[in-house]
Structures are given as structure tokens and as C-alpha cells.
Amino acid sequence: EDRNVGVFMGIMGQDYAFLPRLEDSHIVEAFEGAGLSHSAGVGRISYVFGFEGPSIAVDTASSSSLVAVHQAVRSLQDGNCNMALAGGVNAILAPVNSLLMSKAGLLAPDGRCKSFSAAADGFGRGEGCGVVVLKRLSDAERDGDRVVAVIRGGAVVHNGTTGGITSPSGKAQARVISEALQDARTAPSQVQYLEAHGTGTEFGDPMELGAAASVYGKGRK
């Protein structure tokens, strides 16, 4: 049975999130819907700068900004745009998300991330912004741009069915690494630097490290 099936859905409404505010409906502003929507957050950038290429909000939880970069690369390769801005922003403006993560046991009590440590007990939230400007390499060289790095390949998968919808899968992690290497035409032994997810949990860290070792350990002495 082929399980390599993609799922693509358009999603817009936030009615479920608004349920707790039913009693405060009298204070809802006319522009609140556009101001809170993911699509408007991205669309505003295109609007302000007058960009007319694809303007897409990507939500894949912790991997959102990385998948956004991947999708931007594919859009460039397909000729849908000639330049792309890709990345992500995290601003902690209210305590709600921290409370949710804390109750789910995801946050370290001291707010410090101890990835791949025996003392790992969750991660610490932080604010930041990271954006890259992407172009096809031939276009960047033609235009005399300073090329900082070249993205050789990438891949995206889903865990499928695991012990829980938020539970990771070592098998899926090893698969996405292998597919990315294949797409980049790069041998595991050629990779010298690895940036990990590093959830800082007793459950997630060993799984991620094991997946990375099972792929990148091949061909190494």
C-alpha cells in the first residue's frame, strides 16, 4: 500500500479560536479578521513592496520557516518567481502560547534548552526573525549578487500515524534526511554540519539523534 500521499488543504477561518470571545463580540474591530489571519501577515509584505509573485503563509508547526524556504526554492525552480523572501518571525506578545506549551510539558521550568543532555526537560522560548533572499544561482551570478550559500536540495515528509499527533517519528526523520540528500545529490559523508531540531526532551532528542546517526553515520570512519 502506497502511503506516500500528500495532503493539501486551503484553510482560512479561525472560528474555533474565537469561541472563547463570544461574550466580547461587541469589541470586535472591522479589521481584526485581516489583522489576525496568516495570509494577511504574508500578504502585507507583498502589498507594501508591490511584489506580484506567490505570497503564501506556511504553517507546519516548528518546521514552518524551513518548509517556507523549501517551498520558495521549488517556486524558483518552477519559474513561478524570479526572487523570493523566505523565513519566519517569532514574537512573544501574550502568555497564552507559553501556558499551552507548559501544560503540555514542552517547556523547561528554568526556561533553558538542554538539547541532547541527560538534564533535558523541555525547551526555552525566544523571539527572533530570520529571512533569506533567494534567487536562482545563475540569476544571482548574472546580477552580480553576493552569494552567501547555495541550497542544493530539500525534502518534506509527514510522520504519518505515531503514538500521538504531536509525537515525532525517527523513521520519518531518517527518511526526510535521506530524501533531501538524494535531491541534493550529496552523499551523507559529505555533510560536515548539522542543525538539529533539538526539542530538549527525553523522548524527542534520542529519536532525532538516532535518525541523524542512521543516515549521516554511513560511510564515515
Language-model-detected regions and their locations in the chain:
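Condensing-enzyme catalytic core of the thiolase-fold
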Residues: 1-221
